[in-house]
């Protein structure tokens, strides 16, 4: 942290997951490590705050792209149902009924590092369209 302490607008952005806040059946190790990242973020913010370093975490939800498409496809094949059925079932657990993009997550990171985010620290911010259940 010596370089960060010498930087006037230092900001650390950790990446966790909405699974760290909600829990995730059959994915205990994943959800546990994401929960730990939330606690790490809050603790580090308290430790580094007096030096002017802000620390926050982003909690992405279901991020569109090849990875989640593969997950949906594998689940569809194992259940013997169409891909669209799996996708729709998952998105029914999201209030906004859509996935987020990597760009959505990046835009929040940029905001947190900007002048507009100068007083935000120790926060875990969901970028998820309000995932209700995983």
Region roles according to the model:
Residues 1-11:
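A short helix-coil junction within the Rossmann-fold of NAD(P)-dependent oxidoreductases
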Residues 22-28, 50-51, 97, 115:
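Active-site loop immediately N-terminal to the catalytic Tyr-X3-Lys motif
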Residues 38, 60-70, 74, 78:
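Short, flexible catalytic-loop segment of classical short-chain dehydrogenase/reductase
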Residues 21-22, 98, 109-110, 121-134:
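Short C-terminal tail/terminal secondary-structure segment
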Residues 49, 54, 120-122:
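Short, small/polar-rich loop/turn modules that mediate ligand/substrate recognition or access, typified
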Residues 33, 41:
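Active-site helix of classical SDR
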Residues 17:
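Residue(s) in the substrate-gating loop at a strand-loop-helix junction
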Residues 79-82, 94-105:
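A conserved structural motif in NAD(P)-dependent oxidoreductases
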């Amino acid at each position: 942290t010596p370089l960060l302490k010498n930087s006037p607008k230092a900001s650390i952005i950790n990446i966790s997951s909405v699974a760290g806040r909600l829990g995730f059946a059959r994915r205990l190790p994943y959800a546990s490590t994401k929960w730990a990242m939330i606690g790490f973020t809050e603790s580090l913010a308290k430790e580094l705050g007096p030096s002017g370093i802000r620390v926050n975490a982003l909690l992405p939800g279901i991020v569109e792209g090849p990875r989640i498409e593969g997950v949906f496809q594998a689940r569809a094949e194992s259940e013997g149902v169409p891909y669209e059925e799996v996708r729709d079932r998952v998105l029914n657990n999201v209030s906004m009924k859509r996935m987020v993009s990597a760009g959505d997550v990046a835009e929040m990171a940029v905001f947190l590092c900007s002048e507009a985010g100068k007083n935000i620290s120790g926060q875990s911010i969901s970028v998820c369209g309000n995932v209700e259940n995983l």
